[in-house]
Curated annotation (Swiss-Prot):
Organism: Streptococcus equi subsp. equi (strain 4047)
Name of the molecule in the record: tRNA dimethylallyltransferase
Alphabetized NCBIfam families for the sequence: miaA (TIGR00174)
Family that this chain belongs to: Belongs to the IPP transferase family.
Region annotation (Interaction with substrate tRNA) ranges: 36-39
Swiss-Prot/TrEMBL catalytic activity: adenosine(37) in tRNA + dimethylallyl diphosphate = N(6)-dimethylallyladenosine(37) in tRNA + diphosphate
Gene that this sequence comes from: miaA
Organism classification: Bacteria, Bacillati, Bacillota, Bacilli, Lactobacillales
């Protein structure tokens, strides 16, 4: 069976994924699927770096503004929503382009797991999320306790082995459901950090403080409020930090988040990274996509 070709753009926050996605959508008759756990929420526009109205007018976007802030959203929900969006886009002869930095969501969509028995996929993904909280050392200690030996140290294989061990009768490891071209964007760490600092300043100038205050006053305990971009400003509203201190914390936490994102994609997904500072960018990516789409 022919697998549907999809483009997946990943990388740390503020590296330019949205701009590349829109450019590729225009060049290759594509539509964008957001792969970001926070952009699903309505009213949270600035802190989630959601594509602006102007950007959304340049390319159709899916999985943006599909939940109220009071609702929860999980990897399971994303997989179901993304599959429907891909089917819809392909049915109209267009190219699905997934753009986002929520690694667990993207990995869950691209993995070739098939639930063959009575196991509910929510149970599988809940177990996966539990494993993701473990350090590498804890993960390999768990493998050893179950008598599982891996020849190579690979976190992704370790988690897959534990899932298969846990759900041996209900989980079949089949081929991945899609044929993805995964594009990773990166740059020197200092460059990424400077982009993050500038973007936070721009967000603050664009009304992030008011957006965060609304969330703090109306829904301080919901899942959406735990995302980076909001909770760092809550101490300011509580009188526990100055605005300067809260903004500095937001920048720091966003930089740390970007570092974790890079580590995730390098260790757990087969990502080829392109530096956005290279003279060949983005033409090299256009050429790669063109070759990919021409392949049988």
């Amino acid at each position: 069976m022919t697998k549907e070709k999809i483009i997946v753009i990943v990388g740390p926050t503020a590296v330019g994924k949205t701009a590349l996605g829109i450019a590729l959508a225009g060049a290759f008759n594509g539509e964008i699927i957001s792969g970001d756990s926070q952009q699903v929420y309505r009213h949270l526009d600035i802190g989630t770096a959601k594509a602006s109205a102007r950007e959304q007018a340049l390319a159709v976007h899916h999985l943006i503004d599909i939940r109220e802030v009071t609702e929860s959203y999980s990897a399971f929900d994303f997989v179901q929503d993304a599959k429907r969006a891909i089917e819809d886009i392909v049915s109209r002869g267009k190219l699905p382009i997934i753009v986002g930095g929520t690694g667990l969501y993207l990995q869950s969509l691209l993995e070739g797991y098939h639930l063959g028995g009575d196991l509910d996929q929510k149970e599988l993904l809940a177990y996966r999320q539990q494993l993701e909280t473990l350090t590498d050392t804890e993960l390999y200690q768990l493998l050893a306790s179950k008598g599982i030996h891996l020849d190579q140290v690979n976190r992704r294989r370790a988690i897959r082995s534990l899932e298969l061990n846990q759900f041996a009768r209900d989980l079949e490891n089949q081929e991945a459901p899609y044929n993805p071209l995964i594009i990773g964007l990166t740059d020197e760490r200092e460059v990424i950090y400077e982009r993050i600092n500038k973007r936070v300043d721009l967000m603050m100038a664009s009304g992030l403080l008011e957006e965060a205050r609304w969330l703090f006053e109306q829904y301080p305990a919901v899942q959406a409020s735990r995302g980076i971009g909001y909770k760092e400003l809550f101490p300011y509203f509580q009188g526990q930090a100055s605005l300067e201190e809260a903004t500095a914390t937001l920048k720091q936490q966003t930089r740390r988040f970007a570092k974790r994102q890079l580590t995730w994609f390098r260790n757990r997904m087969a990502v080829r990274f392109d530096s956005i500072s290279e003279s060949s960018y983005p033409q090299a990516i256009y050429d790669r996509v063109e070759r990919f789409l021409k392949e049988p």
